[in-house]
Each structure stands twice: as C-alpha cells, then as structure tokens.
C-alpha cells in the first residue's frame, strides 16, 4: 500500500512539474467570429503540444489596434502572438518590431499562400513576417426576399446608384428593416476602412503623386455626401456605434436589407445556427460608379511574433498550426 501511495505521489508530482514547466503563450486577437472559433479549437493545439499553454486576450478591433501598437512600439512584451493587419506587417517588419517566421516547420506550405496576400506579409529581405489567418475582400450581401418585394433584381456588378435606390425602397421602419447597414463606428479599421474603399469607386484618393492630401477634392465630397445621406435615409439608428460585428448581428437578425462589408461574413450570414435569414441571402460585387473602380479591398488578419517575445519557437508552432492546411 505504501509503495502504491508513493508511486501515485510521484506521478502527481511529475504531472504538476509538467504543467509548471509548460510555456504559456499570450495571444492578442480581435473579437471576430473566426477568431472565436480558433479559441474554441485551442485544445486541439495543446493536445499535440502539451508543453505549451495558451492564454487569450480578445479585444474589440479598435482596442486591439491601440493595445498591440503601444506594446510593440514600447517593447512592452505583453504578447507572444499578435493578430495584426496587412497594413502593419511591412511597416513593423522594417522597424524591426517583428520576428521573421523562419521556423514554421518543414511541412508548412508557404507556396500555398495567395501571392497577393503573401507579398504584403513579406519584408524587404524576402522573409515572411506574418502568416494569414484569413484573407478577405468586400462585397454586397443582401436579402433576396426584400429585393424581390421592392420589385428589383440585384445585378452581379451593381452601381452605387442602384444601391442607393434599392436601399431606400427596401427600408421599412415600421417593420424594423433598414435598407442598408454600413460601418459607422469611428476608427481607421472601422468606418475609414469602408469609406476609403468606397472613395476609390468615386475616383478619390488620399494623396496625389507629390503626397499632397486630396481630402478637399470633389471626389471625397461626393463620397461622403452619398454616404451620409444614404445612412440617414436607409441606415439603422445609432449607426455611428456600428462596426463589423454590430452590423453582422443586425443582418443576422433580419434588420438589414443590404450590408456591404468583408467577404468573410458569408459563412456567418448563411449559417442557420446564427442567422435568421440564412436561406434568403444573396451576394454581389462591391459597387462602382462607372469609373471602372469598385469599392472593394484586399485585407488579411495575420498572426505575427513581436520581437520582444521570449517564446518565439512556441509562438511559431502555434502560428504554423492555426494557419495550416489541416486547420
């Protein structure tokens, strides 16, 4: 009996020692649906890597940007893996703020990454500094039943003129239906992401060839006038508080006739477990104004290792798992 007790004690001590010696990765991410799914699958990773534990810091998009930017610029070292956008990667890599992902494993197929996305994550030294968790563009998502009720047919490639007309005709305030839901929450990754893409369709740009700001040009005025009038006439109340997640919830609840936003939303608006209108959703290209330019973007949410992390090998193991083909 004493021998058995001693053996059990030894086993318990070894187990506790194993837990104590495990590295804990602190991962900062955005509170988007796909990242929530990733967190739910964490046990799959830790089962294969029992020497690594994972601690999540999940933040609203604007807060995430502020926190990770402050941390990496000050070399705070709070996070071992950061979720960052395509915009930040080349800039931060050039500053020496990110570690190159040169230890993703022999099985990791870098050539499987879409060239347009991969090039945005590659530094001047041709090394990969972040791996895409997912890439996206933007598109029109709409209620087919409400479009039909309004006596309209959504073109595969709509114009902003059509979108404006359809949004107003689909609006039914008494029934709680907004003709269109668009980002209004302040933030360069919220309303400014949408407005910048939209302005492209109107021929606007931020700077000219001499880096002179162009915000006082008529193309920007046309963009903003259209946006404000459309949101007042056909948008939801409190639109200035709505970003991606808020508009997603409104669309899933059947309160939006149309929504122009990230293509990644398709799986959420068509999932009957989450969406009350899952079987009524159609898709179309982002709108244009006849200039041959559409209001769509190229974006990716990526996983990167800050230079201040002391757990780079474990961090790259996690990134390799989360961005692999098997995942």
Predicted regions and their residues:
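Hinge/lid segment of periplasmic solute-binding proteins
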Residues: 85-137, 161-162, 178, 191, ...
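Glycine-centered hinge/linker elements that transmit conformational signals in sensory
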Residues: 166-169, 209-241, 282, 286
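Extracytoplasmic/periplasmic solute-binding protein
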Residues: 127-133, 138, 162-212, 256
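Extracytoplasmic "Venus flytrap"/periplasmic binding protein-like
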Residues: 43-116, 149-151, 250, 254-258, ...
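Extracytoplasmic/periplasmic substrate-recognition and gating elements
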Residues: 47-48, 146-150, 225, 229-234, ...
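Short, polar/charged alpha-helical segment
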Residues: 32-53, 141
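Short, well-ordered beta-strand elements
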Residues: 23-32, 52-57, 80-81, 129, ...
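Extracytoplasmic "Venus flytrap"
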Residues: 25-40, 57-61, 136, 189
């Amino acid at each position: 009996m004493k021998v058995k007790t001693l053996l059990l004690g030894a086993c318990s001590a070894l187990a506790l020692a194993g837990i104590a010696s495990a590295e804990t990765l602190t991962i900062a991410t955005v509170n988007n649906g796909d990242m929530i799914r990733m967190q739910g699958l964490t046990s799959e990773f830790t089962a294969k890597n029992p020497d690594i534990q994972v601690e999540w810091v999940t933040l609203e998009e604007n807060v995430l940007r502020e926190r990770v930017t402050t941390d990496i610029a000050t070399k705070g070292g709070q996070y071992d893996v950061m979720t960052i956008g395509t915009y930040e990667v080349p800039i931060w890599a050039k500053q020496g703020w990110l570690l190159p992902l040169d230890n993703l494993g022999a099985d990791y197929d870098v050539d499987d990454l879409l060239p347009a996305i991969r090039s945005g994550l590659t530094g001047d030294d041709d090394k990969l500094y972040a791996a895409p968790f997912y890439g996206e563009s933007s598109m029109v998502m709409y209620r087919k039943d409400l479009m039909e009720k309004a006596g309209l047919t959504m073109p595969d490639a709509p114009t902003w003129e059509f979108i404006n007309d359809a949004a107003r005709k689909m609006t039914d305030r008494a029934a709680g239906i907004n003709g269109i839901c668009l980002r209004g929450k302040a933030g360069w990754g919220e309303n400014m992401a949408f407005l910048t893409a939209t302005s492209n369709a109107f021929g606007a740009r931020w700077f000219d060839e001499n880096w002179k700001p162009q915000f006082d040009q008529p193309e920007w005025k046309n963009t903003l006038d259209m946006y404000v009038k459309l949101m007042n006439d056909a948008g939801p109340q409190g639109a200035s508080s709505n970003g991606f997640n808020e508009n997603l919830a409104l669309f899933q609840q059947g309160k939006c006739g149309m929504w122009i936003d990230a293509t990644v939303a398709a799986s959420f608006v068509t999932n009957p477990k989450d969406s009350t209108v899952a079987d009524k959703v159609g898709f179309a290209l982002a709108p244009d104004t006849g200039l041959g330019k559409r209001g769509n973007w190229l974006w990716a949410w990526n996983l990167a290792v800050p230079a201040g992390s002391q757990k780079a090998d474990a961090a790259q193991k996690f990134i390799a798992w989360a961005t692999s083909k098997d995942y």
